[in-house]
Amino acid sequence: YVFGSSFGFILGSSSLLFSALISGGFGPWLPFQMIAIGLVGFGAGALPQIRTPRLLLIPYAVLASFTFGALMTMWNWPYLAGLGSSVSFVPGAGVAENLIRFIRFEIATGGLIWDLGRAVTTSALIGVTATTLLATLKRAANRAVVEKLTNRN
């Protein structure tokens, strides 16, 4: 939010990469996590700067939590649901039909419950810490010296 879209995407993606390096959390899900959380950071950086940022950041946190959860479920949904069930991905079917199947899969696996927990926790933390944290980040942004890279040939 404070440092912009590009920084948000890079920070989100790289933080998951370094987290995986430290914790050994490498797997086929890592690139999807990096892209999904990078998009969350990108979206936060694209939000307009307003006088009361909590009013904007809390709804964004709810939307981003459910979007992140859906993106993370999408990467493995065709494999976990199998073939031929009412929740499985059907190649060649329309978007609406597969979307209905995906929503059924999310409900059946409890994915929406995890997303709801993520949304509530994130919103509560933003509600409690936003004022102090944003003031600190804005102060750091004002004190930082950042220059654009240019080709000096």
Give the predicted meaning of each segment.
Residues 26-31, 46-152:
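Membrane-embedded alpha-helical hairpins and interfacial helices in multi-pass inner-membrane proteins
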